């Protein structure tokens, strides 16, 4: 992000604003962690901040601080669009192409608000007035930490904000094991722990609250695991029938793809999940 952009955003956020924060459709830990962390920070700054998620997200993320005030666009369409149309600022987090927020694309595109993108994926689109994009970052949640740092407001980060950001970083790095988990990432995590964030509490809430059905679905996924040794590639498939049989709930397949990466010799892993009601097969 350019110095002029930082200065302009500081001025923009210097007085109370109506702000909307939007994660991508089917929000994961990083999307919700970064959104809620940023929202709590902006509220401490005196802004009216609202997280509007395009649709529902996993139960294991609903303990996060600020979760009770998240608006589900899919369930509260009219309310959401009124808030979006009257917003002064819209932050889009953890995505860089507007269609990734589903049916929210049009109201966001039509809004007169200043738009700010914070994201770590490749090839960002040019819809935002200000773009903070860094493909070398492990997560958008770490970028939100650095955004707050650029605003010279690290003193605003408390345990609640820290828990949200820690969750996002942890989940998007498979518990800090992916290559983009750098020494800077660990320094950020250390700062959050020093603030009082309890890492074991977060780990338990995310990884140790499995339903019986989810573990059975994991077993099904492992049974479907294939390894193309000549291509150093593994993949998992799950059909709609298999999802239904095991009582699939949103978020149940979170992290399944990482098991494919754990195979010796695997350099690429993918999971293909059939969603007949939406007419699509998702690939992660």
Task: Give, region by region, the residue ranges found by the protein language model.
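Active-site cofactor/cluster-binding pocket
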Residues: 71-130
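Generic enzyme active-site microenvironment
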Residues: 22, 26, 92, 117-118, ...
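Glycine-rich, phosphate-binding/catalytic loops in enzymes
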Residues: 38-39, 107-110, 133-134, 187
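Short alpha-helices
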Residues: 118-188
């Amino acid at each position: 992000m350019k110095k002029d952009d930082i200065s302009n955003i500081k001025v923009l956020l210097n007085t109370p604003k109506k702000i909307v924060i939007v994660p991508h459709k089917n929000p994961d830990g990083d999307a919700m962690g970064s959104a809620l962390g940023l929202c709590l920070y902006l509220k401490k700054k005196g802004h009216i901040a609202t997280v509007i998620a395009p649709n529902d997200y996993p139960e294991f993320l609903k303990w996060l601080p600020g979760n009770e005030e998240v608006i589900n666009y899919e369930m509260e369409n009219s309310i959401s669009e009124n808030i979006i149309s009257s917003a002064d600022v819209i932050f889009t987090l953890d995505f860089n192409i507007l269609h990734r927020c589903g049916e929210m694309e049009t109201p966001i595109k039509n809004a007169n608000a200043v738009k700010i993108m914070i994201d770590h994926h490749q090839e960002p689109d040019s819809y935002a007035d200000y773009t903070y994009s860094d493909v070398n970052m492990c997560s958008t949640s770490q970028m939100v930490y650095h955004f707050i740092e650029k605003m010279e407001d690290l003193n605003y980060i408390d345990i609640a904000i820290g828990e949200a950001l820690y969750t996002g970083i942890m989940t998007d790095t498979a518990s800090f094991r992916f290559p983009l988990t750098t020494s800077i990432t660990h320094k950020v995590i250390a700062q959050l722990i020093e603030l009082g964030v309890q890492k074991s509490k977060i780990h338990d809430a995310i990884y140790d609250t499995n339903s019986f059905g989810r573990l059975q679905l994991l077993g099904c996924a492992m049974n479907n695991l294939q390894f193309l040794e000549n291509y150093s590639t593994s993949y998992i498939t799950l059909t709609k029938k298999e999802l239904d049989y095991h009582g699939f709930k949103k978020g149940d397949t979170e992290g399944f793809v990482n098991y494919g990466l754990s195979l010796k010799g695997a350099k690429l892993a993918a999971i293909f999940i059939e969603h007949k009601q939406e007419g699509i097969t998702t690939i992660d």
